[in-house]
Amino acid sequence: MAESPVTKRAAPGHTPERVVFFTDAVFAIAMTLLVIEIPRPEASDFDPGDGVSKTEAVSRLWHFIAHQGSSFFAYVLAFYILWIVWREHHRLFDQVSEMSRAMIGLHFPLLLLAAFLPYPTTVIGHYASNPVAAFGFTLAVGGLLLCRTLIHMRALRDGVLLPDVDRQKFQAEVTVSFIVTAYWLATLVLAWWAPWVLIAWTLTSLVAEIARRAVVRRAEAHKQQA
């Protein structure tokens, strides 16, 4: 009777499941903390009554909420960034059989920065015109994107991708990720002109799409030449 083939198992501590669960938890907590730091109306003069008319209360509350515009913008931007990084992380771990030591090590700064992001988000939300606030937020996000990119790069180099994964397509995604990270870190030079640097940050998705099309076009050209 023929013996069944032995399935190769990941080395102890290198299985992706526990890292994925822990990463999901850290990102979920970080994304929740983002909204907690947005200032809330607490003064009694936001309520009609006690000498405050309904019209006055509405006006005061509206002005208070409008004054928090930079905080809401920072919240949406940071939430979107965390969601993108988490989504790419999810896609990566659907394509690997195990984790290399380098990939595990890179999760320390990745999760450290993800958990830290609510702090610079709060600072930039309160002081959007301060270059120090813009500089800190740019560094935190840039570091987070760099860690994500390096994890993807190590997955490709360390031979942990599943057999059916298109290596060329995966390499293209890594290249795009490097370009986006470089673009974000390049906005450090614009930090002095805060809050105008916010415009550059909102263009990140557009830069990613342009880079993706350029990389794909170049890969197809190389195929034709080969």
Which residues does each PLM region occupy?
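Multi-pass alpha-helical transmembrane bundle typical of ion/small-solute transporters
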Residues: 2-226
